[in-house]
């Protein structure tokens, strides 16, 4: 009930045109509530999730999402762990690794 109240009290009168959610599950739940409130997605409001969960592509309106590239993160972590295992006597220096996320554009934006 709190989400419905927020939609009616804040989103509709506030002129908000998009929402970035912390994950795809929240985006999926919010999608249902927005549609129930009579809003169109992405017409009235755009919606973007985070995680690129498989279900986000199969939602009533497939959800645009940010893929944080977990495969690359895991690959870097495994490589670093193997380096430590193979060279246990050396001093290991912290490394900064950047993995580029990807915007997966679907129907909610």
For the regions a language model picked out, list residue spans one by one.
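Flexible loop/turn connectors
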Residues: 4-109
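Short beta-strand elements in bilobed, periplasmic/extracellular small-molecule ligand-binding domains
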Residues: 1
